[in-house]
């Protein structure tokens, strides 16, 4: 199984670290440098556009003062010094803004209602606007649910004839534009449950022009990494750092030195490798960092992957826990005449061995395990899910039967996830209720009708989710948030910690991402968050990387095309272009691989950049492993 392979690789890396620890005196002065960066959010990490606050102007009315305050609240310099100019002296001295930020779309969408009292010496301004998102104290950016709103009150008073704020909320209110300017989206990295693969935990970090941005971010990233994952991701991941571990972080001219305290110094080599991996992957997102030194309680430690003083971030040691969840160049798999073919990175096609490629059993949907040793298929003729080895003597074995199965996905542990559509059963049950006698002995027709309508008001389960581990009975996945929601697609992340689902009808719906939590004998999906909110419809989705989806969707104006969607929850979906002359029907993606799309003309197109899609092969429903 995949998990076993990764655990072996991790053990090898630990052994390397143990050898390196024995020779710490060989560490180059100043620490190793970073090479082979990858992953994470780089972009505008090391740049900053400073807001020049206007400050309160003489003669401003109540509305104008609060509006100006909200604009200047986007300046984080000197602990919101500009925003405090709008307050009374007493208020400015005691106001302590919280780490929670409420995000609204734009100032034009904000409503100000003014009530002036006490002979125009005191006033109250009520501020209301739709809530776009919340940045939680742990840094997570959480998109708002439909109908959520900001509704806060500012108390004003006159000071020397000018309005000033005397009382206000502790929560920061920022426009989306302010968030884009002040915050940097980055990842913290933790491990999945068997410590085989790193998992990104997207966070938003505020920056200020008063201190070197890389210095700010490196210190904040390490502190947050040691504090633990966001509340949302915490139940699904693990950390190598012992509880209570603290660190000092020093940055100078591209060199970061992290000194972990005695708790980390007592860790065994395997755990020490994990701590190093989490730090390396987290810090290498910052492009200004050229050298990294790790100390344990003051003693310098050599890290795996160091060659001539250069830390190779893409070395075998670090790649053993790569967040991508897979290494090398995986093949894609597609259907042609109901049989399975493979397509390698050079676009050479081949009929796969065994029953999947040469047998007489035709499949409707398919998914290939991450190690490319097994294929799962949905059989349209007998309502079953079957699995076959991808080998010359590989034959299909039925693993699930008797349902209307619609979607398949493999995780890195070798588990197969299956979506079962219960809508036909629900519709039949409702028809039977309609045909049933409205009355029972002692009932009135009105009473029984009201009772039936009450029963229907409860959510009926229209989707059932299954988890199939090798050589084990199927387990029904507990997903209460999806109980009454039709799920048309489910894709589990390759690290096994999150799922992306497509909800709605056959014409497209909403993208949600939830966490995967394993109990002793149960599996549950929890805390779903919306993604790709700028798309009016989405018809297919795939994991492109550990922190990004590829989807087929449509904006309010435009045709169906490919988009890239970040899991950090903010910003607009990025266009990945469209196939010319043919409607796109499916999409699949994998880390470092071209996007592939199946079209209405039973051809598969490929794209390595956003501007050009090329026809690759004849076939339908291409998928990468996963």
Swiss-Prot record:
It is a lipid-anchor. Residues 1-23 form the signal peptide. It is found in: Cell membrane. GO terms for cellular component: plasma membrane. Belongs to the LpqB lipoprotein family. Transmembrane segments: none annotated. SMART domains: Germane. A lipid is attached at residue 24 (N-palmitoyl cysteine). Pfam families: Germane, Gmad1. The keyword Metal-binding does not apply. Keywords: Cell membrane, Lipoprotein, Membrane, Palmitate, Signal. Residues 430-441 have a biased composition (Acidic residues). The keyword Acyltransferase does not apply. A lipid is attached at residue 24 (S-diacylglycerol cysteine). Residues 428-457 are annotated as: Disordered. This is Lipoprotein LpqB.
């Amino acid at each position: 199984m995949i998990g076993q392979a990764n655990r072996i690789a991790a053990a090898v890396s630990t052994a390397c670290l143990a050898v390196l620890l024995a020779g710490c005196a060989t560490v180059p002065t100043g620490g190793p440098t970073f090479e082979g960066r990858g992953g994470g959010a780089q972009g505008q990490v090391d740049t900053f556009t400073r807001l020049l606050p206007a400050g309160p102007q003489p003669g401003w009315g109540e509305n104008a003062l609060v509006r100006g305050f909200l604009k200047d609240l986007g300046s984080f310099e000197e602990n919101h010094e500009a925003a405090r100019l709008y307050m009374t002296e007493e208020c400015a001295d005691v106001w302590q803004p919280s780490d929670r930020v409420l995000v609204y779309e734009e100032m034009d969408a904000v409503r100000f209602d003014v009530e002036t009292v006490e002979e125009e010496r005191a006033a109250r301004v009520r501020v209301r606007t739709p809530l776009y998102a919340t940045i939680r104290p742990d840094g997570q950016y959480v998109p708002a649910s439909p109908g959520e709103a900001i509704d806060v009150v500012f108390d004003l008073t006159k000071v020397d004839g000018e309005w000033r704020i005397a009382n206000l909320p502790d929560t920061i209110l920022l426009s989306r534009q302010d968030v884009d300017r002040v915050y940097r989206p980055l990842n913290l990295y933790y491990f999945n449950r068997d410590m085989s693969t790193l998992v990104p935990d997207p966070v938003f970090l505020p920056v200020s022009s008063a201190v070197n941005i890389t210095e700010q971010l490196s210190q904040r990233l390490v502190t947050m990494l040691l504090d633990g994952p966001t509340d949302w991701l915490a139940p699904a991941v693990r950390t190598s750092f012992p509880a209570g571990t603290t660190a000092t972080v020093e940055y100078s001219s591209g060199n970061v030195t992290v000194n972990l305290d005695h708790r980390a110094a007592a860790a065994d080599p395997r755990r020490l490798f994990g701590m190093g991996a989490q730090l390396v992957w987290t810090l290498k997102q910052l492009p200004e960092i050229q050298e990294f030194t790790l100390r344990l309680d003051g003693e310098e430690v050599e890290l795996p992957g160091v060659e001539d003083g250069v830390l190779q971030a893409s070395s075998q040691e670090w790649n053993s826990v790569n967040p991508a969840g897979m290494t090398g160049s995986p093949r894609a798999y597609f259907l042609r005449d109901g049989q399975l073919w493979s397509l390698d990175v050079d676009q050479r096609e081949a009929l796969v061995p065994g029953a999947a490629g040469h047998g007489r059993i035709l499949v409707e949907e398919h998914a290939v395990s991450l190690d490319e040793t097994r294929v799962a298929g949905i059989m349209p003729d007998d309502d079953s899910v079957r699995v076959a080895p991808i080998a010359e003597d590989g034959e299909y074995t039925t693993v699930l039967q008797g349902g209307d199965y619609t979607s398949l996905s493999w995780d890195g542990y070798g588990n197969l996830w299956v979506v079962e559509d219960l809508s036909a059963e629900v519709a039949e049950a409702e028809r039977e209720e309609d045909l049933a006698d409205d009355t029972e002995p002692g009932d009135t027709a009105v009473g029984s009708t009201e009772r039936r309508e009450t029963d229907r008001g409860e959510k009926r389960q229209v989707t059932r989710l299954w988890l199939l581990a090798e050589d084990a009975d199927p387990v029904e996945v507990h997903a209460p948030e999806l109980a009454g929601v039709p799920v048309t697609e489910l894709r589990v992340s390759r690290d096994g910690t999150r799922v992306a689902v497509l909800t709605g009808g056959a014409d497209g719906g909403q993208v949600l991402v939830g966490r995967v939590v394993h109990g002793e004998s149960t599996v549950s999906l929890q805390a779903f968050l919306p993604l790709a909110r700028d798309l009016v419809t989405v018809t297919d989705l795939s994991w492109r990387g550990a922190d990004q989806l590829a989807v087929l969707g449509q904006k309010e104006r435009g045709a169906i095309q490919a988009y890239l969607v970040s899991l950090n929850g903010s910003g607009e979906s990025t266009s990945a272009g469209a196939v010319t002359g043919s409607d796109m029907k499916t999409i699949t993606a994998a880390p470092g691989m071209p996007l592939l799309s199946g079209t209405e003309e039973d051809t598969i197109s490929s794209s390595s950049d956003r501007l050009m899609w090329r026809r690759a092969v004849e076939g339908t429903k291409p998928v990468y492993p996963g």
